[in-house]
Each structure stands twice: as C-alpha cells, then as structure tokens.
Amino acid sequence: MKKILIMLLAGIMMLTSGCLAVGSADNGGNKKVANRIAVIQTNKGTIEIELFEDKTPITTKNFIDLAQKGFYDGIIFHRVIDGFMIQGGDPTGLGTGGPGYTIEDEFRDDLTFDGEGILAMANTGMPHTGGSQFFITLAKTPWLNNHHTIFGKVVKGMDVVRDIGHTQVGFQDRPVHDVVMEKVTIKEAE
C-alpha cells in the first residue's frame, strides 16, 4: 500500500511538473518584439523615433511602408508652432495633401500626449482621416488624447525637434526657410 501511495504521488508530481513546464515554455514564447526606429534626416539634424508597432500596428505599418517607398524623402515640415508641435508628411507642402487614401484611428488609453516628443498622425478633425501627415509634440498636449493616433516617441534628436520648433514662421505657421526631411529610413531596434 505504501509503495502504491508513493508511486501515485510520484506520478502526480511528474504530471504536474510536466504541465508547469509546458506553461512556462508557452509564456516564454510570448516575448515582446522590439519596435523599429524611424530615422528622419532633416536639414537641421537627425531625429530617431521608436515606432509603437506593438500598440498601433495599422498606423505604424502605414508609416513604415511610406518611408520604405521614399514617400517622405524631400518633403518639408509645413507647419511649425513653437511650444506645441511640428508637422510634416504632406507631399504638396500645403497641409492638404496625403497618400491618396486614409487609415483607421487607433486610440489607446495607455498612449497619451503626456510630454514632448510624441509622434502622432495628423487628421482633418474627422474620424479615420489620417494618411501620411504626422506631427511631433513640443509640450504636453492632453486635449489631443483620443483625437490623434499616437504611434511613436522621439528617442534621440529631441534637440533637433526643439530647434525646428524655434524656426521663424510666416503665413499658416509655415517656416520662412524650408525645413526638409531629406531622408526617412527605418532601422531595427538596438
């Protein structure tokens, strides 16, 4: 009887440890994928932005696809408001253009305009009207929460963003001297 009890307990322990091992392997297989980095080379310096592929996949895929096609290369930051944001991504340079399509909004409670360096999709003020235009904040802007999809954050070159923010502007907040995105590339996370 004692042998049967010991064998039964040993069997239960083996089954339990086997189940735990499977659970651990499963949990270990769900590793967080590192987000890629957008590198925006401007005539004022370079900005690096972590793209939130894990949280806003539609918007980041759209941005990455456009960047990899060279869509942003040579486009200006057409709207600059010191203390608020810098905006670019319009192929016409007038603030009215885009890629010829729009994408869905991806608002998240865990992504907020809580400081400078937030990358978000510009829109017309109506739902699901983002396309290629984006902006980077120069300050905390909580009134924009749930109105613009946040899809990244500056990780290097915030001094360049601030410098662009101090650019002299004219009519419709357009820089007097063009601030050009010379090249926009995507690199793997470090």
Residue spans for each PLM region:
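Cyclophilin-like peptidyl-prolyl cis-trans isomerases
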Residues: 4-190
